[in-house]
Amino acid sequence: MLGLKSAIDFERVRRDGRSHAHPLVVLIALRRPPTDPLQPAGSRFGFVAGKGAGIAVARNRAKRLLREAARACAPEVGPGWDLVFIARKPLAAARQAEASVAVRGLLRRAQVVRDEQGTAG
């Protein structure tokens, strides 16, 4: 699972990507151009928990929940996607199973999960 690191990449995804909301988390997905030789072939994941998600302990827990849920779903995600998960306040009080269901549902709704033929979106 590759990480989105730079502020420029996060800003590009937030500006140009499509957003999908769930009560626990928001997903912003952006398909990278397939001909970009500077980008890795796999999908990249970024995790954000702003101050609206609670105190630092709650924000860190929310990001841990999101990372673990995304790690479990990463093999199903097609290549070439930049995905940013934004934690909402109720996520910090949620269980791992609830976070996993939310992430998996958002990935399906965004059509970034590979289907039976191995293609995504």
PLM feature spans:
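Positively charged, solvent-exposed patches that mediate nucleic-acid binding
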Residues: 1-121
